[in-house]
Amino acid sequence: CMKMETNGGGAGKIIGRMFSGETLFRNSYTANKDGLIAFASSFPGKIVAIDVEPGKEVIIQKSAFLASEENVETSVFFNKKFSSGIFGGEGFILTKISGHGTCFIEIDGSTVEYNLLPGQQMVIDTGYLAMMDATCKMDIQSVPGLKNKFLGGEGLFNTVVTGPGKIVVQTMPISAVANSLARFFPQGK
């Protein structure tokens, strides 16, 4: 038999979840005997299991948290570069995963993982960074040159991640899918 309990974790936790795009309340499930629980992603993509250990925090895009064991904590992570929030697709409010246990996150599309060396940088289209080790730094950089900005079709800004640490890039963020499909919908007058 499975027991379910809904809890907000206090006003501070609820406000933090509101900022990071999560649901305000969490459901806790406890099995009185052997049992299984299943969960699904809200968009076609991949569910990724993360083994969380003390001192090895992970930063994920807001609203990517799906489920975790009870000793895993989520908190609001503010990107120190305000320009990242104004111009970047990732925003300056992200979610930090810490504690001990397994956490599940949902990623749009497929994933591609990279291990960055200290000081090594990767330039990514904004909105495509799904996850990074907390040892990585993220910044937003303007696309150089007027020709690139206006004729390149890739947007005005890129996300720059600097190692050391692992990063996970998603191949199909929901925002990119929505933009691609929008041109097929009739425009109202």
Question: PLM features: residue spans?
Answer:
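Phosphate/adenylate-binding glycine loop and adjacent helical scaffold
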Residues: 1-189
